[in-house]
Amino acid sequence: MNNKKNLLIIAGLAILAIIVIIIVANLGNRQAGPVSQSGEEIRIAPTDLDRETPIATPEEVMQAKPVIEGTSKVLDNVVVTPTGKPVKNDVRPGSPEAPQQTAPVNPETLPSDSVKLTGSAAGFSPDRFEVKAGQLVTLSLTSVDDMTHVLLFADPELSAVAIGVGPNETRAITFNAPKAGEYPFHCDVPGHLSRGEKGVMVVN
C-alpha cells in the first residue's frame, strides 16, 4: 500500500516538474515588450539599424504587410522599403527610402494604437504625444476644417516623416521612433506655424 502511494507521489512530482519546465521555457522564449494604455504590447525595434543592408529577402518582403494599406511594409517591427532595407527617416519625404504615407483613408479604419492628430486653424490636437525609442508608430493627421495641413518635424532626423492632407481628409504614415528626446513638429503651410499649429513628440 505504501509502495503504491509512494509511486503515485513520485509520478505526480515528475508531472509537476515537467509542467514547470515547459512554463519556464515558454516564458524564456517570449519577448515581452512595453504595454500601451490599451493593454496591447508596444512594438519596438532597435534604433541603431544598418539602413543600407536588407534585413529581409525579396520573398519575405512580399509576405510582409503594412500596418494600414498604403503605408510601408513592416517586418519584425521594422518599417522596410520594397527592397527589404529599413526605411530612412532622414531623407526627402516620398522618396523610395522614406516611410510612405497613405492615400486618403477613413479614420475609423486606423488601428486602435495609432497616434491620431487633427489639424485646424486652432492648431494640432493633441499637440503632444509620447512614444518609446524604436517603437513602431502609426501617425495620422486629419484636417477638420476646409484647409490643407502639412505636418513636418523640425529635426532633420525626421525629415521623411511628413503627412499632407487636404480639407477634411485623413492620411497616415508608419515609422520607427528615433532615439529618446523631444521632437517638435509644425504645419508647413505658410502662415500656419505663426498662428500656433505646432506640437511635440516625446520619445522615451
Regions found by a protein language model. Give the residues of each.
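Membrane interfacial helix-start segments of signal peptides and signal-anchor transmembrane helices
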Residues: M1-V20
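Extracellular/periplasmic metallocenter environments
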Residues: I21, V35-S36, E41-L110, G166-N204
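Sec-dependent signal peptide cleavage junction
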Residues: I23-P34
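N-terminal edge beta-strand
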Residues: N106-L136
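Exposed beta-strand and adjacent loop surfaces of beta-rich binding modules
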Residues: S114, L136, T148-V150, E182
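Non-cytosolic beta-sheet module surface loops
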Residues: A121, L141-S143, A177, G191
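Beta-strand-rich interaction surfaces with strong enrichment in secreted/lumenal proteins
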Residues: P126-F129, S159-V165, I173-T174
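Histidine- and aromatic-enriched segments that form or immediately flank copper-ligand environments
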Residues: V144-P167, S194
